[in-house]
């Protein structure tokens, strides 16, 4: 099965969700070192959504730096987004942005820490996803 690459801020919400999955994962560093963080195999990105003015700043800067590396970007196969439904139409917006910019499927979105159902859906979805032609 492929790799999960994720970013989690100090809140650790995304980190806790990924830990519940029990899948192989690599965390994008929270500091400015994201540009030096390299992944050289296929991965699905799990990204939190930050709400800004009109959706600006939805994708964390560390994730942008990571994806600005052409080789990292070349290995992304899909995206999953975390968000907060209180933000209305910007809920999970980071997933839309990454999906469009990287031309990969937006596979799933979940709220905050995710529910047990979200964990099961993502875990089973990843198993199905990686058994197809995404490697």
From Swiss-Prot:
It comes from the Bacteria. Pfam families: Flavodoxin_NdrI. GO terms for molecular function: FMN binding. Transmembrane segments: none annotated. GO terms for biological process: protein modification process. Belongs to the NrdI family. Probably involved in ribonucleotide reductase function. This is Protein NrdI. It comes from Rhizobium johnstonii (strain DSM 114642 / LMG 32736 / 3841) (Rhizobium leguminosarum bv. viciae). The lineage of its organism: Bacteria, Pseudomonadati, Pseudomonadota, Alphaproteobacteria, Hyphomicrobiales.
């Amino acid at each position: 099965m492929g790799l999960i690459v994720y970013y989690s801020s100090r809140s650790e919400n995304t980190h806790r969700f990924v830990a519940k999955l029990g899948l192989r994962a690599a965390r994008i560093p929270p500091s400015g070192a994201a540009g030096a963080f390299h992944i050289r195999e296929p991965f699905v990105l799990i990204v939190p959504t930050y709400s800004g003015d009109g959706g600006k700043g939805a994708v964390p800067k560390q994730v942008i730096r990571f994806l600005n590396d052409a080789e990292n970007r070349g290995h992304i196969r899909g995206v999953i987004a975390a968000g907060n439904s209180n933000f209305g139409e910007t809920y999970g917006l980071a997933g839309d942005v990454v999906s469009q910019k990287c031309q990969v499927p937006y596979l799933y979105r979940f709220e905050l820490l995710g529910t047990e159902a979200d964990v099961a859906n993502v875990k089973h979805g990843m198993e199905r996803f990686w058994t197809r032609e995404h490697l």
